[in-house]
Each structure stands twice: as structure tokens, then as C-alpha cells.
Amino acid sequence: MQNKSEAELSGSLPMPNNRCRIDGTQGKIMYDGDIELGRNDECWCGSGKKYKKCHMEFDERLDKLARTGEDVPPRALLKTPAEIEGIKRSAEVNIGVLDYIAEHIGPGISTEQVDKWVYDYTTEHGGIPADLGFEGYPKSVCTSINEVVCHGIPSEEDILKEGDIVNVDCSTIKDGFFSDSSRMFCIGEVSKEKADLVRVTKEAVHKGLEAIRPWGHLGDIGAAVNAYAKENGYSVVREFGGHGIGNEFHEEPFVSFVTKPGTGMVLVPGLCFTIEPMINMGKARIDMSDPNGWTVRTKDGLPTAQWEVQLVITEDGYELLSW
């Protein structure tokens, strides 16, 4: 329950329209609570340019959109060019890990061995496995086999066998920047049903990418993914999705794949997030009752698949960062 002072701060009393900048001049409070820079101040993006020559019009557009009721990301979520370069350096390691796994994974390999590959490759290339220790997670990677939707914990006992499909979800920290992507691997010869699920899930990610329009909406992506999955007779997990990432492992926004076009956060250039739908062969319901507190399975025990990419919105579309 809020006390009176908290309620007052949250809007029951009128807030001033202006606050003092560092130089003592008055600045308008922007939609995200920050004070608008002075025209001749150095821009917040790190370009070294004056604000009026850089992001002033951009910020005014954001402010106007927010005041019409649009869900506009705070500018703190928008990645600067320097931050994007840092994320790319992290992603180079993350992509390299998954490429290494692609060359070595196969029947007879334990998921514990996959975890060791991830840890060794990442640390040898100057990175840190982002999964390791995150909210108590015990391993360096997630390995989700067949009916495991996500957060499969590597184990000596889980030996990959002919006909399995497995998602390897890898995340890296390097120089303080985060990257994240996952791939599906077919172990030996798999059934047509499993192969089709893996293929369609990857195609669904591309449908989501095709739906991206700068200044469009996050819901456009989820709607495109969901429609394609349903066209092919599959269902989409509601409880898990993509997320913002870059300076932290999990940032806003949550990227749902059960959405309507024209809804959700505005896709503002600089917004960085993942697209990672979890698509089930059967029903969408999931089982989160595993005693380890992490591993999620399909409720009906049928196979599931997931591919994940990380991207940043640009002025003319998007740039893939990790895959």
C-alpha cells in the first residue's frame, strides 16, 4: 500500500513542467522523466555534436508520440553507436561459440560436454557466459531437448541420440556488454515431423524480421511470427518470449509472440532486443513443475523448437547482431 508521500509523487499532485539543468537554466521534463538538453549542449548519444544538430528533433518526436499515448521506450534503453559496437564485440564471441558447437555436436555427446565447450570457448575469447550464476542458474548454457521448451540444464546424464532435436541457447558478456542467441540442432537423422518443426520455427523468426518497420510497433513482430506458426499447424508459447538486451542481460521490452499488429512498444532506432519464439508441435500449454526450478516442458510432451536472434532497430530497418 502506498503512503501519502508516494501517492503524491506518483501523480496526485501536479508536477512542474520544468526543472533546472546543471547550468541553472530551465529545461522541460521529457516523457521519460529526464530533462531536455539545451540546444547547444553535447548530445546524449556520444556523437560529440551539439544537441540541436543531432538528436533534438528525434527527442521531440519521441516526446510527441508518448503524449499521444504510444508506448515509447525511454531514451536510456536506446543504444548509442558506441554501445552497439560493444554489443557487436560480445556477439562475435557468442556467434563463435554456436559455430563451434555446430561443428562438434552429434550423437553420443552429453549436454554437460556442450556446457564445457561453451565455458571454455567463451572464457578463452575474453568473455563470460552470461547464464552462469544468473539468478542462481548453475550452468553456462541452456540445452533443451525435444519436449523441453527452455532452460534445460546441461547434465552428464543427458546424452544426445539419433533423432533428437536440441536448442542450444548461448549468452555472452564481454567488456560489460551482453549478447544472446540460440540455434536448433538436429542430431543425426530426425523424423520429418521434427525437421519440419525446426524449419518452420526458423522461418517464423524471419517472418518476424520482415515485419520490422522503424517507428512501427513491437506487436507487428509477434503477430507475424504467430500467424506463420498457426498457418503451419503449430502453437506459440505465451509465457516466454524475447527481451531487451545490451547493457544488461534482460532489459525492457518483453517481446511477446502472442500479439496484435499495431500494438506494443514503438520500434525506435537504437532499441535492441531478441526475437526468440518457442513453437510447439502440439498445444501451447507448458509445464513448469520441474523440481530444479528452471526446466520448462510442453504440457502434452510433444516436441518444441526455438531459434533466437538479437538485433538493433536502425533508421532504415534493423541490423542483426547475434544469431
Give the residues covered by each predicted segment:
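Active-site neighborhoods and metal-handling regions in enzymes and metal-associated proteins
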Residues: G38, S47-K53, E57-W323
